[in-house]
Amino acid sequence: MAGLGANSDVMVKLDDGHLNNSLRSPVQAGVYFRGHIKGGMRPGKKVLVMGIVDHNPKSFAISLTCGDSEDPPADVAIELKVVFTNQQVFRNSCISGESDEENLAFPYFPFVPDQPFRMEIFCQQPCFRVLVDGHHLFDFYHRIQTLSAIDSIKISGDLQITKLG
């Protein structure tokens, strides 16, 4: 099954344009998702992504960004890239077009083909705390200090999105 593709022309938006509703049915393969985080991030706020990994995945990515501009590209507060070929999770940010060095960031690899997952990204004062299926995966210290500017989410790759919150 093909995955959510970054080059896809199909856009999926929630009814009210905000990331505070469940999707009525899974977002099918071949879709690139962009959504708005109502009010932006702040300490104590959580972003929930539930999905099912495709049958034969290569990778998927989840990014929290400052807007959804493509030109110039929006600042990326945190990008999580899950790569199945070598079972790695990378984390990164990109501010004013300058990417940090990608950090390999996991004590274990929690993603399994054809299986559901629940990822929670908690915004805390010094960092994002990322949990998968209730287990701590890593902390990522903020590179963007104005947390409320982090108001968009992008998801692409080899997965189906079943719920956002």
UniProtKB/Swiss-Prot annotation:
Keyword terms: Lectin
Assembly notes: Monomer.
Source species: Mus musculus
CDD domains referenced in this protein's UniProt entry, alphabetically: GLECT
Galectin domain boundaries: 32-161
InterPro entries on file: ConA-like_dom_sf (IPR013320), Galectin-like (IPR044156), Galectin_CRD (IPR001079)
Described purpose of this protein according to its UniProt entry: Does not bind lactose, and may not bind carbohydrates.
Pfam family name, one: Gal-bind_lectin
Coiled coil: none
Protein name: Galectin-like protein 2
Keyword Isomerase: no
Gene3D superfamilies: 2.60.120.200
GO MF terms held by the record: carbohydrate binding
